[in-house]
């Protein structure tokens, strides 16, 4: 069993940006003390939904501030920056941390990112696949060159080279069937969404495994991650109530940060996300409180035993044993840390014990 901690860097209305950055640093350091293997950093621009425009820089700080903790991105918006510059950053972090950096990628969901950084969002999938291919070759060969419809440049040496054999581990934030199939072709581990239920997670893994096996990958040796919003309290009602205000603002900020969910938006390649949003609306989840209530049904928010039951159900359905939680909805920094420590003492050991008994 492995455990990760998502650091969202969302700015609630009552907090300044300086307070959010202090929270990021403190929670990163505390994560190592609380037995988490990895912290994950999210890339966002131009929105309070996330203040971290450059996760590479934040990762460098946290890697330097810790001794054993892995630090990953969940995820870098791959098509909005030049692939050579990105590999230089990834290799540098891989070298300086002696292999503790994790390179999580996605193709992006937010229109402003693409407009400001000069990338056509309609091509996000093709660019992501192209950029990944260039970066992966650069990780193993030490050189990069390109001559295709998306990008052209002469062969260059990438410095520094990777520290880890084959390069820093790559993860993919995957929600749609097409992204799942693409990740499976390369045997890349997925970070599964916290907004889908157990049956949906199981179906996604079944699709992945079918494709991965066709491409010759050992599906029993792929480090997928289950992601969750998490709040642990001996009083289940308190666990839910402490998160409600944060999640309400956070959900609304997410919807407002992109026009993808607007029926008038014609951006190509996001049919899955638009369809998922329509399903939310039909279920009444456009109402923020109803979305929060549904989130509580499928995420570990409650007593330690309730959290164990929810996570173990997903572990048993998917076989995934890398559990990644986000605790920032728990209020103040002290309240967040208290929930993390209770998760460490009253949830982690029992998930490990049950997992061992299943082997």
Curated annotation (Swiss-Prot):
Signal peptide: none
InterPro entries (alphabetical): Alkanal_monooxygenase, Bact_Lucif_Oxidored, Bacterial_luciferase_CS, Luciferase-like_dom, Luciferase-like_sf, Luciferase_bac/NFP
Recorded GO CC terms: cytosol
Record bears the keyword Oxidoreductase: yes
Keyword terms, alphabetized: Flavoprotein, FMN, Luminescence, Monooxygenase, Oxidoreductase, Photoprotein
GO biological process: bioluminescence
PROSITE patterns found in the cross-reference section: BACTERIAL_LUCIFERASE
Annotated Pfam families: Bac_luciferase
Top-rank lineage group of the source organism: Bacteria
Name under which the protein is recorded: Alkanal monooxygenase alpha chain
């Amino acid at each position: 069993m492995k455990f990760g901690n998502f650091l969202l860097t969302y700015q609630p209305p009552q907090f300044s940006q300086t307070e959010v950055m202090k929270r990021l640093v403190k929670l990163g350091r505390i994560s190592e003390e609380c037995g988490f293997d990895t912290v994950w950093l999210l890339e966002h621009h131009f929105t309070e939904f996330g203040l971290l425009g450059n996760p590479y820089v934040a990762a460098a700080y946290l890697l330097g501030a810790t001794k054993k903790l892995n630090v990953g991105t969940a995820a870098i918006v791959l098509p909005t920056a030049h692939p050579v510059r990105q590999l230089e950053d990834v290799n540098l972090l891989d070298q300086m941390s002696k292999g503790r950096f994790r390179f999580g990628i996605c193709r992006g969901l937010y229109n402003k990112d693409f407009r400001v950084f000069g990338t056509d969002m309609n091509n996000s999938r093709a660019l992501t696949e192209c950029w990944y291919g260039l970066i992966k070759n650069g990780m193993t060969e030490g050189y990069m060159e390109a001559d295709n419809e998306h990008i052209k440049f002469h062969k260059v040496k990438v410095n520094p080279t990777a520290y880890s054999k084959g390069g820093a581990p790559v993860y993919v934030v995957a929600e749609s069937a097409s992204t799942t199939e693409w990740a499976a072709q390369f045997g890349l581990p997925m970070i599964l969404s916290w907004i889908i239920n157990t049956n949906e997670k199981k179906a996604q893994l079944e699709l992945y495994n079918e494709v991965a096996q066709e491409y010759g990958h050992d599906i029993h040796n792929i480090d997928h991650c289950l992601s969750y919003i998490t709040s642990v309290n001996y009083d289940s009602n308190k666990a839910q109530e402490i998160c409600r205000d944060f999640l309400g603002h956070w959900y609304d900020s997410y919807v407002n940060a992109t026009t993808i969910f607007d029926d008038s938006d014609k951006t190509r390649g996001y049919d899955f996300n638009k369809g998922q949003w329509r399903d939310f609306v039909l279920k009444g989840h456009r109402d923020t409180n109803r979305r929060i209530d549904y989130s509580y049904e499928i995420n570990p928010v409650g007593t330690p035993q309730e959290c164990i039951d929810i996570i173990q159900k997903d572990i048993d359905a998917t076989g995934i044993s890398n559990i990644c939680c986000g605790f920032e909805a728990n209020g103040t920094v002290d309240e967040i840390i208290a929930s993390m420590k209770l998760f460490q003492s009253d949830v982690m050991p029992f998930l490990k014990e049950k997992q061992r008994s299943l082997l």
